[in-house]
Amino acid sequence: MPSFDVVSELDKHEVQNAVDNAIKELDRRYDLKGKGSFEFKDKDQTVMLTAEEEFQLEAMLEILRLALVKRKIDVKCLETKDPYPSGKEKKQEAKFREGIDKDLAKKIVATIKDGKLKVQAAIQGEQVRVTGKKRDDLQEAIALLRTKEFDMPLQFNNFRD
């Protein structure tokens, strides 16, 4: 029986490259030279932005988003927290989200069921497995999910016949 998985994954190397590009861009910017820094923690996939003022944090966040887009990483996976003061400077944390949580998985399953397609969707941890009798039904399910807007970028992998 044909099936595929709906997942939300990040390419760790591309994320690292995007952060490195943002750091280089920050060094090139005359208005931000020496006034801010990015600190990427690979272990928990977070970026700590540090700057003297809040408007500089906003500019740095925009630099990071542009670097992500250039590396073809969807910016919906970037979750930013509110800036907070730390001594003489301001800090802001940005976390890269990965995996499908239960609420999003339920929305995906509901979307597939509301589409009245001849497929079944089952939640399996941080992914949703979609099975059907024909490959065409699965392709319709993929097309349906691509038309909908979710708060996380979705990828479709493990397509089996």
Curated annotation (Swiss-Prot):
MF terms (GO), sorted A to Z: nucleotide binding
Keywords noted in UniProt: Nucleotide-binding
Keyword field contains Nucleotide-binding: yes
Domain of life: Bacteria
Gene3D superfamilies reported in the protein's UniProt record: 3.30.70.860, YajQ-like, domain 2
A cellular component annotation (GO) from this entry: cytosol
UniProt entry tagged with the keyword Lipid metabolism: no
Family matches, as InterPro entries: DUF520, UPF0234-like_C, UPF0234_N, YajQ-like_sf
Job description of the protein: Nucleotide-binding protein.
Similarity remark: Belongs to the YajQ family.
Database matches in PANTHER family: UPF0234 PROTEIN YAJQ (PTHR30476:SF0)
Protein name in UniProt: Nucleotide-binding protein PputGB1_4497
Species annotation: Pseudomonas putida (strain GB-1)
Lineage: Bacteria, Pseudomonadati, Pseudomonadota, Gammaproteobacteria, Pseudomonadales
